[in-house]
């Protein structure tokens, strides 16, 4: 732009050359210089206006009739505008706006065309290029836990531990309206673990019917809490339906996932191999996973949720060990598990489950159940795992549960009155019963747990959690066999950005 201004000044000087050829007086020269300076200043002002670097002059207002003023809209996380910046609309009023990799095609198109360079609303900002083509957002989460167990008949279970449930850092973004990507690593075990890492394409089939396709290292779409991120679960640990009725590869696998979205639900189909690893000596396991959810009732203050899911996997020759030690009273107490005992020689597994729940105003409830059938070598009978749970919560501050109607899971809440703005935050009371049964094996155990909890959301991305768990186990193998029961209390500080 400096070169344009210089050229403009030269044009003005050249236009004055004939006058200089007439050998003007000193007064004429001074007048000419003043005229040229005025012309150059006028041209520069026009260029500044084209660049948008100068503010528009306020309209004249009669002194006797001052124009009424309208106070600026409050800058809330879910607002459609923050100053002049357009913020992406959330999928529900009680949620924060989605990041670039979770937007539908209409949200992406609107944000790209808005002309904003920065959006705020979900922790760290979303950055846009000036032309609206490129979108970028840093992302991450910090979940710090402390837990203490007491009351067990085994001293080895009565321990107090600390840990990082998640310590993630990553990024997400998009190019244009349709292409998007996400990458995230976890450092919670004091080593690097790749979690989500994918690219995707989204589009609209017709009004009210969208799709996207993701390829890469994908998080399972399986069950209500199983599809909810670790930073959004209402309890410190997911239900045993999510942790026990699961493919052998775990929560992630490398593959492809097309998803279809309509106004009252969604469906997904996933085909994956193993997790990201360094073992390319044998073929991966093959896992096919599908899930669908439907909201037959969906209003501004209530939702009914119905969901079904299932998976089938053919196990690799390197993944035939099916031994399970499932969390029942706290992730960071390694002695507190429900165990299958040693189980070798797996050929394939099939799992399925159902979800039923919803919310009315600030109260929510969710029931989940599932089974997993493992087929074994050597003519042995199948191993059947069974799990179910019933959960509920009440936001005593009147906030709506952070239910995401697009995905059929919980998400980041939009807190009505954050403490950083002088409010109380959002306070939620929770309760859950869960039951797990591995006793179809001679060495398999069983267990159940009842949890009472409190979640205090300081704002939309900072949360304090407290859980009190009464657990009961009866293992037939391992160091802690026979009936045993006790208490585990846990606290968490969580920040998601």
Each PLM stretch: what is its role?
Residues 16-18:
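N-terminal signal peptide c-region/cleavage motif recognized by signal peptidases
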Residues 61, 81-98, 170-188, 255-282, ...:
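Glycine/serine-rich loop-strand microenvironments at binding/catalytic pocket rims
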Residues 118-119, 249-250, 347-348:
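A short catalytic or substrate-binding loop motif that flags glycine-/basic-rich loops and adjacent residues
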Residues 122-316, 385, 389, 394-421, ...:
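Outer membrane beta-barrel
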Residues 1-8:
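Bacterial N-terminal signal peptides that target proteins for export
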Residues 320-497:
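Outer-membrane beta-barrel pore domains
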Residues 21-143, 396, 400-414:
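N-terminal periplasmic/intermembrane-space "pro-region" immediately following the signal or transit peptide
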């Amino acid at each position: 732009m400096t070169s344009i201004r210089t050229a403009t000044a030269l044009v003005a000087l050249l236009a004055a050359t004939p006058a200089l050829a007439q050998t003007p007086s000193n007064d004429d020269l001074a007048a000419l210089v003043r005229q040229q300076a005025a012309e150059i200043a006028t041209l520069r002002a026009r260029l500044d206006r084209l660049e948008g670097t100068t503010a528009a002059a306020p309209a004249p207002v009669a002194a006797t009739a001052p124009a009424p003023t309208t106070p600026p809209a409050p800058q809330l996380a879910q607002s459609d505008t923050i100053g002049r910046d357009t913020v992406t609309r959330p999928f529900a009023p009680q949620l924060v706006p989605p990041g670039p990799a979770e937007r539908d095609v209409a949200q992406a198109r609107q944000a790209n065309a808005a002309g904003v360079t920065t959006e705020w609303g979900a922790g760290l900002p979303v950055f846009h290029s000036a032309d609206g083509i490129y979108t970028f957002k840093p992302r991450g989460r910090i979940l710090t836990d402390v837990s203490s167990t007491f009351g067990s008949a085994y001293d080895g279970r009565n321990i107090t531990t600390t840990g990082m449930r998640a310590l993630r850092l990553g990024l997400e973004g998009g190019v244009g309206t349709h292409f998007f990507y996400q990458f995230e690593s976890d450092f919670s075990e004091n080593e690097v673990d790749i979690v989500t890492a994918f690219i995707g394409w989204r589009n609209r089939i017709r009004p009210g019917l969208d799709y996207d396709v993701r390829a890469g290292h994908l998080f399972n779409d399986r069950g209500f809490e199983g599809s909810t991120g670790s930073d959004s679960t209402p309890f410190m640990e997911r239900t045993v339906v999510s942790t026990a009725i699961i493919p052998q590869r775990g929560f992630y696998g490398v593959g492809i996932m097309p998803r279809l979205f309509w106004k009252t639900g969604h469906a997904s189909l996933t085909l994956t191999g193993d997790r990201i690893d360094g073992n390319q000596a044998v073929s991966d396991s093959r896992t096919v996973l599908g899930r669908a959810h439907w909201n037959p009732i969906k209003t501004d203050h209530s939702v009914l949720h119905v969901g079904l899911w299932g998976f089938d996997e053919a196990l690799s020759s390197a993944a035939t060990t099916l031994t399970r030690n499932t969390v029942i009273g706290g992730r960071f107490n390694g002695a507190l598990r429900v165990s299958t005992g040693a189980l070798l020689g797996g050929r394939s597994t099939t799992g399925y489950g159902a979800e039923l729940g919803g919310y009315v105003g600030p109260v929510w409830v969710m029931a989940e159940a599932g089974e997993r059938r493992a087929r074994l070598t050597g003519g042995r009978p199948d191993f059947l795992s069974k799990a179910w749970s019933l959960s509920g919560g009440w936001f005593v501050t009147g906030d709506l549960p952070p239910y995401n109607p697009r995905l059929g899971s919980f998400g980041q809440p939009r807190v009505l009155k954050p403490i950083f703005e002088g409010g109380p935050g959002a306070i939620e009371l929770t309760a859950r019963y869960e039951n797990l049964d591995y006793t179809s094996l001679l060495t398999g155990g069983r267990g159940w747990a009842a949890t009472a909890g409190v979640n205090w959301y300081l704002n939309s991305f900072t949360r304090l959690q407290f859980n009190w768990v009464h657990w009961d186990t009866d293992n037939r193998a391992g160091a802690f066999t026979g009936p045993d029961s006790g208490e585990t209390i846990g606290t968490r500080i969580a920040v998601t950005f």
